[in-house]
């Protein structure tokens, strides 16, 4: 039996399916490429405020606005951001990946992978880290989204954990481990710990 090849949508296909099984809002046709679309970075980041992150507990964080003049990211820090765009996909698998132009500056995106699910809707949370200080700006074109056809039955996204997200989403791993959203972390002098680090 001949297998059906899994195919990536071209930029033209992406545009022709907008409003049907693909939603990208806002959409700018100038950001289409031959087989992807460039998504942009919103104007805010999130950083954790725990010296040790606990997978079984919600971890405290603070928000960092990205000013128009830019924000310098530092090595050794995990930054969470999100896309400006809200996307919705039906019957296709969306995948995002960092742009090579930023990788060549030492800025890397989502090392854990960015495989979406058919039926996902919301903004995308982005995991950013750099190998040397790098300055970023609000609404830069941060990543590319591609759409892949699915072979076989494709049930819509059933998980509500990150579905319908309109904000940066920190890890919710603690829910998978059976813990609730109560803050069980000890108070830590995060700024003092950073200042005292040799």
Curated annotation (Swiss-Prot):
Q: Which GO molecular function terms does the record list?
A: dCTP deaminase activity; nucleotide binding
What Gene3D superfamilies does UniProt report for this protein, alphabetically?
Answer: 2.70.40.10
Q: Which GO terms describe its biological process?
A: dUMP biosynthetic process; dUTP biosynthetic process; nucleobase-containing small molecule interconversion
Q: Where does dCTP bind?
A: 99-104, 125-127, 144
Keywords of this protein's UniProt record, alphabetized? Hydrolase, Nucleotide metabolism, Nucleotide-binding
In the record, the note on similarity to other proteins reads: Belongs to the dCTP deaminase family.
Q: How is this protein organized at the quaternary level? A: Homotrimer.
Q: What does this chain do?
A: Catalyzes the deamination of dCTP to dUTP.
Q: What is this protein called?
A: dCTP deaminase
């Amino acid at each position: 039996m001949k297998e059906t090849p899994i195919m990536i949508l071209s930029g033209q296909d992406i545009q022709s399916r907008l409003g049907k099984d693909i939603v990208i809002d806002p959409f700018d046709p100038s950001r289409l490429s031959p087989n992807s679309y460039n998504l942009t970075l919103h104007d805010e980041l999130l950083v954790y405020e725990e010296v040790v992150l606990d997978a079984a507990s919600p971890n405290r964080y603070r928000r960092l606005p990205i000013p128009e003049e830019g924000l310098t990211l530092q090595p050794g820090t995990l930054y969470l951001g999100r896309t400006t765009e809200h996307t919705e996909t039906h019957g296709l698998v969306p995948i995002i990946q960092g742009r090579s132009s930023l990788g060549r500056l030492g800025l890397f995106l989502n090392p854990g992978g960015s495989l979406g699910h058919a039926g996902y809707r919301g903004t995308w949370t982005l995991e950013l880290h750099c190998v040397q200080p790098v300055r970023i700006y609000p609404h830069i074109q941060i990543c590319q989204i591609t759409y892949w056809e699915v072979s076989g039955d494709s049930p819509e996204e059933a998980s509500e954990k990150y579905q319908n997200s309109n904000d940066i989403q920190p890890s919710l791993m603690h829910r998978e481990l059976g813990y609730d959203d109560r803050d069980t972390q000890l108070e830590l002098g995060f700024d003092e710990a950073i200042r005292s680090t040799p």
